[in-house]
């Protein structure tokens, strides 16, 4: 849900990106959720396989059912297709250009936010974030207290515990 509809477009836009896809020989499958940066409702995911032969390992079959054998290649069973229709409509509406535009906006804001956070001596951005999210914390101040204070002002964030951090997932308007 975090990288599948973000990292490929960031890579297209020329942002330095470690290999994460089928360019790595060891990657045989990629799961991509369509919510968050795919902008679809929850409940739709994709599974990309390097080789069609791998599909044989993604079947579910159950013989002990009164109606007979039940076999499916999806774990969704007989759920309705509303989320799927939503995802299709959003993808058709945005197209690659729409996703690229949103990723470009998010990356620009993320860069400014990281620069601003790094300008505060007591704060540290953890790692080298490549996606539209990042975490930051402090070894000098209680970052959870900072998060609580920001929440009172309407700024909500996720929290991480190892190391203690605030997690920001950015989005384009």
Enumerate the language-model features and the residues they cover:
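Catalytic nucleophile loop
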Residues: 1-4
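Glycine-rich, often proline-containing surface loops adjacent to acidic residues and nearby aromatics
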Residues: 87, 166-167
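PLP-dependent enzyme catalytic core of the Aspartate aminotransferase-like
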Residues: 169-173
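Active-site C-terminal subdomain of aminotransferase-like
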Residues: 8-132, 136-141
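A short linear hydrophobic-aromatic micro-motif
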Residues: 121-124, 155-159
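Short amphipathic alpha-helices in soluble, non-transmembrane regions
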Residues: 146-153
């Amino acid at each position: 849900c975090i990288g599948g509809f973000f990292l490929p477009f960031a890579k297209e836009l020329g942002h330095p990106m470690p290999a994460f896809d089928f360019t790595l020989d060891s990657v045989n499958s990629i799961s991509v959720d369509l919510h968050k940066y795919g902008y679809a409702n929850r409940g739709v995911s994709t599974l990309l396989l390097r080789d069609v032969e791998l599909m044989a390992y993604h079947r579910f079959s159950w013989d002990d059912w009164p109606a007979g054998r039940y076999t499916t290649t999806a774990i969704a069973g007989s759920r309705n297709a509303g989320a799927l229709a939503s995802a299709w409509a959003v993808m058709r509406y945005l197209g690659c250009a729409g996703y690229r535009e949103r990723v470009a906006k998010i990356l620009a804001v993320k860069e400014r936010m990281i620069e601003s956070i790094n300008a505060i001596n007591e704060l540290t951005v953890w790692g080298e974030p490549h996606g539209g999210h990042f975490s930051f914390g402090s070894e000098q101040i209680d970052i959870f207290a900072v998060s609580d204070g920001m929440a009172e002002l309407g700024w909500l964030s996720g929290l991480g515990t190892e190391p203690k951090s605030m997690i920001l997932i950015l989005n384009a308007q």
